[in-house]
From Swiss-Prot:
Its main location: secreted. The modification 4-hydroxyproline is found at P11. Expressed by the venom duct. The keyword Secreted applies. This is Conotoxin QcIIIB. Belongs to the conotoxin M superfamily. Keywords: Disulfide bond, Hydroxylation, Secreted, Toxin. It comes from Conus quercinus (Oak cone). The cysteine framework is III (CC-C-C-CC). Disulfide bonds join C1-C13, C2-C9, C6-C12. GO terms for molecular function: toxin activity.
Length: 15
């Protein structure tokens, strides 16, 4: 994703 804690594309960040 776009955050450092988001290593997969899940709805936790805007992108």
């Amino acid at each position: 994703c776009c955050s450092r804690h988001c290593w997969v594309c899940i709805p936790c960040c805007p992108n």
